[in-house]
From Swiss-Prot:
Name used for this protein in its record: Adenosylcobinamide-GDP ribazoletransferase
Cofactor(s) needed by this chain: Mg(2+)
Source organism phylogeny: Bacteria, Bacillati, Actinomycetota, Actinomycetes, Mycobacteriales
Entry GO terms, CC: plasma membrane
Keyword terms, alphabetized: Cell membrane, Cobalamin biosynthesis, Magnesium, Membrane, Transferase, Transmembrane, Transmembrane helix
Protein purpose: Joins adenosylcobinamide-GDP and alpha-ribazole to generate adenosylcobalamin (Ado-cobalamin). Also synthesizes adenosylcobalamin 5'-phosphate from adenosylcobinamide-GDP and alpha-ribazole 5'-phosphate.
Stated family: Belongs to the CobS family.
Listed transmembrane segments: 35-55, 59-79, 110-130, 134-154, 175-195, 199-219, 229-249
Catalytic activity: alpha-ribazole + adenosylcob(III)inamide-GDP = adenosylcob(III)alamin + GMP + H(+); alpha-ribazole 5'-phosphate + adenosylcob(III)inamide-GDP = adenosylcob(III)alamin 5'-phosphate + GMP + H(+)
Pathway named in the protein's UniProt entry: Cofactor biosynthesis; adenosylcobalamin biosynthesis; adenosylcobalamin from cob(II)yrinate a,c-diamide: step 7/7
One matching Pfam family: CobS
Species: Mycobacterium avium (strain 104)
Listed EC numbers: 2.7.8.26
Subcellular location as annotated: Cell membrane
């Protein structure tokens, strides 16, 4: 278990991990990925809260700095998946052509637009959540939800896209019991994410639903999941969860 956890942190962050204590990304590391999400969520929440202290509750800078911190510590791994997946989905061609577009090193207009929307939406939502609560648990929950979405995307019956090494390593690797357990943990944590107990669960379920729809569409479009698809699902789920929660706390 510790080896899988170290592998998950090595994959999902820039934190140094002993080479002998980690292995290749696979089933165990994917199962442990939500733990990385908890750590990243705590970091984002702390930065967003610090931003409200320094710049005031009405400033969006705290949320923007929280997103910047996440991008730095994850080396932009998942946001790159957003860009590549958006470009692939915007390609009018057969699956092999769409996969080739995703593997291309350049970023097209769809990718640029998707990244801008995701970064700005997360930044503004994180700022709103940090301003509305003494402790911005909602920020941490949204980031955590994104990594739970990755586990759901790797559940049994979900295939890997042709040519994707990461997809081949993790697609179909997560039993339903593991996915259900992480969703249960997420829902439990989300109960304290908003002023009312139902705010958090509604927000994260909406986020997970959007992530699942994206994954399903990508499976049809690309023939399966890849590392880029997982990154896009993570970021979409986190973004929708944060935006939905920011809206619900005002109800």
């Amino acid at each position: 278990m510790m080896r899988s956890l170290a592998t998950a942190f090595a994959f999902g962050t820039v934190l140094p991990m002993p080479a002998g204590g980690r292995g290749p990304m696979g089933r165990g590391a994917m199962t442990a990925l939500p733990v990385v999400g908890l750590a990243l969520g705590a970091l984002a929440a702390a930065v967003a809260w610090g931003g409200t202290v320094v710049f005031g509750r009405s400033s969006p800078l705290g949320g923007l700095l929280a997103v910047a911190a996440l991008l730095l510590i994850t080396r932009g791994l998942h946001i790159d998946g957003v860009a590549d997946t958006a470009d692939g989905l915007g390609c009018y061609g057969p699956p092999d052509r769409a996969r080739a577009v995703m593997r291309d090193g350049s970023t097209g207009p769809f990718g640029v637009a998707a990244v801008v929307v995701v970064v700005m939406a997360q930044a503004l939502a994180f700022s709103a959540l940090a301003a509305g609560r003494p402790v911005p648990v909602g920020v941490a929950v949204a980031v955590f939800a994104g990594r739970v979405a990755a586990v759901l995307a790797c559940r049994r019956t979900v295939p890997a896209a042709a040519g994707s090494s990461l997809g081949a390593a993790v697609a179909g690797s997560q039993p339903a019991t593991v996915a259900a357990a992480w969703v249960a943990v997420l829902l439990g944590m989300s109960l304290v994410a908003g002023p009312r107990p139902w705010h958090g669960p509604v927000a994260v379920l909406l986020g997970l639903g959007c992530g699942a729809v994206l994954v399903r569409h990508c499976v049809r479009r690309f023939g399966g999941i890849s590392g880029d698809v997982l990154g896009a699902a993570i970021e979409l789920t986190a973004t929708v969860s944060a935006v939905a929660l920011a809206a619900l706390v005002r109800v």
